């Protein structure tokens, strides 16, 4: 079973209820839900929230695979980690250890069905214990002490010869439930 899990708090301090603010004509969280609804590999989509307004927004769309999970208040506060609500849900629902758990961030609305499909296909090959999404960054980075992090400044590479670095973009993560329970983390083992 493949579960897509979208944690969305109502109490964001920077932008209250940001996950249901209109973004290009629809609530922000709906972009990922709709992409996941079209992904044939995903069996169930869980929106974990503490907000009645977010729940109303999601339920009003009448999605077929999507359900709302009411997360505990202690796992919806500013100091709670995403892992805390993931573990809460996994333990509450007693998911099987071999179920595939895909953490999806509502704040990455440009993620398309194809991205989910390709990543789940990659994961199904068994080469990796967990997977994360990245973008390739072609910038040169420095430490505050004046040392370069990812290149030799005395032999500065031409852009065409610089492979850059992969930067985690946080769009989504894939792991097995058993790995998450064992590590307490969205990523574990051999990461792809």
List the predicted regions and their residue ranges:
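Short internal beta-strands
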Residues: 44-49, 133-134
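Conserved core of the sugar-phosphate nucleotidyltransferase
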Residues: 78-88, 97, 108-192
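Short phosphate-binding loop-to-helix
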Residues: 46, 52-102, 111-114, 118
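N-terminal nucleotide-binding beta1-loop-alpha1 segment
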Residues: 1-16
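Residues at the starts of beta-strands that form the adenosine-phosphate
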Residues: 1, 43-45, 100, 129
């Amino acid at each position: 079973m493949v579960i897509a899990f979208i944690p969305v708090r109502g109490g964001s301090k920077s932008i209250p209820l940001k996950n249901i603010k209109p973004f290009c004509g629809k609530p922000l969280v709906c972009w990922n839900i709709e992409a996941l609804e079209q992904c044939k590999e995903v069996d169930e989509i869980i929106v974990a929230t503490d907000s009645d307004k977010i729940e109303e927004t999601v339920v009003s769309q009448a999605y077929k695979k999507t359900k709302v999970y009411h997360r505990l208040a202690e796992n919806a506060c500013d100091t709670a980690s995403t892992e805390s609500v993931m573990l809460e849900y996994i333990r509450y629902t007693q998911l099987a250890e071999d179920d595939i758990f895909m953490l999806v961030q509502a704040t990455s609305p440009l993620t398309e069905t194809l991205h989910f499909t390709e990543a789940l296909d990659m994961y199904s090959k068994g080469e990796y214990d967990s997977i994360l999404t990245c973008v390739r960054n072609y910038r040169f980075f420095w430490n505050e002490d004046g040392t370069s992090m990812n290149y030799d400044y005395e032999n500065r590479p031409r852009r065409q010869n610089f492979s850059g670095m992969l930067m985690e973009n946080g769009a989504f993560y894939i792991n097995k439930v058993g790995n998450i329970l064992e590590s307490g983390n969205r990523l574990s083992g051999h990461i792809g």
